[in-house]
Amino acid sequence: MYLGIDIGTSAVKLVCAEADQILSTASVALDVSSPEPGWSEQHPDQWWQATCRALGQLSGRIALSEIKAIGLSGQMHGAVLLDRNKRPIRPAILWNDSRAVQECDDLRAAQPQIGHISGVLPLPGFTAPKIAWLRRHEPDRYGQLAHILLPKDYIGLRLHGALATDASDAAGTLWLDQSKRAWSPDIAKATDVELDWLPPVFDGHDIVGTVTAEAAAETGLPAGLPVVAGGGDAATGAVSLGATESGRGFISLGTSGQLFVADKVFRPNPERYVHAFAHTLPDRWYQMAAMLNGARPISWIGGQLGFSAAEVVALAETVSGDRLPIFLPYLTGERSPLGDPHIRGCFYGLEDSTTRADICRAVVESIAFCFADAAQSFGDTIDSLPELSAIGGGSQSDLLLGLIATTIGKPIVRPEGADSGPAYGAARLAACGHGALSMTDLADQPPETDRFEPGDPTALTARLNRFRALYSAVKAVD
């Protein structure tokens, strides 16, 4: 039995699995703090406390003593800043934080070729510009800085006491030279970072430590249990689906959204803000369009109207038509393919007759339109894919998957365990590190439970064109 721990933005999720079957899951919700407009933070100890609580839930259903190894997964890009005692000096600055706009401009000027080294152009959500921001705006805290980790790696530190990361999570910092899978001294220097602040980089299935006696006492896990490096949530989601070989892709619908295509070569496309990153497995890379808002607008509008996410989708299913409002879902700016941290959301086309169902439909459609824009940014790469799998909480919506299939013109497959993707992928990496699975086994794809074929695109194409025109108009005003 193998344990996968995924440090998400909205929850810590645990999956206990055999090599090819999920046995049990647990989840503990997380809160996000926004002390200033555009800021997004979580304290790393909140992740640890939630992990311990989730393990407590899991222990009521399975024997933790039977776990053979642990794999880690987590939200990418978060800046976990530690002092010499390996304790946090401030809350972590998350992937959807937009404070470091000026620092991104400075980094582009200092490193004009950064997109072809780091695989993407600088944007505020990435880790590197946040350190330059810290030096400029919080010099006392910058002076305490001795180690920089990513969210899942802090949980690794609490479990086994070692500083470590993997290539796929390191890829999202901007400090990684993607083709070499090693830290770039020049980019580190340009962002006021010492190389010895950054952890060693491993492959995702490498064992990097074992559970300490102290961690065992806090979690109920056996001391000495091996822990593998794991991966960023995009890469572990890929491992859960067998998207480790060229020509396989998927969409992820969580708080953020991703369109992911595996590759055997490093293929940068920075001009369209398509991320070209190292995979968590050796000699593999991927291209990914990353959307900051994903399925989050559904929960956002639900919060405004007093509905659950499921109720929003159910209402959206009751209406359709060209006179519905258009919604821009850019609640925290947008990354792929716009590279626009300043754009914000809005409704256009509200009328006296507009209903709550109309508004809900507009919000759900907007997510599909974002994926259509993302697919377009890939060019010919996306055309070669026969289908795309779907994971994440938003993948449970038949309406949303059908809309995405139609807007991008590809069948969408919902596999078994779709809502547990990254945590399950982390468990599979643990099984690989322990010897129960081979690299070849990790390419196995789970059975599909549902399939969504593209529908008639005519009506949606007209609304998609209005969606794109609305972005251009709002950007001009902004």
Model-derived regions: residue spans:
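Extracytoplasmic/secreted proteins and extracellular or luminal domains
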Residues: 60-63, 194, 381
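Short beta-strand-loop/turn "lid" adjacent to the catalytic site in phosphate-handling enzymes
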Residues: 56-95, 120-125, 156-177, 200-203, ...
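Short, conserved phosphate/pyrophosphate- and ester-handling motifs at nucleotide-, phospho-/glycolipid
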Residues: 43, 97, 233
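Gly/Ser-rich phosphate-binding catalytic loop and adjacent alpha/beta segment
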Residues: 100
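A generic structural motif
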Residues: 28-31, 95, 292
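Active-site core segments that coordinate phosphate-bearing ligands/cofactors
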Residues: 3-4, 13-16, 105-126, 132-164, ...
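A structural motif corresponding to the C-terminal end of an alpha-helix
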Residues: 190-197
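N-terminal glycine/serine-rich phosphate-binding loop of ATP-dependent small-molecule kinases
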Residues: 1-90, 116, 144, 216-217, ...
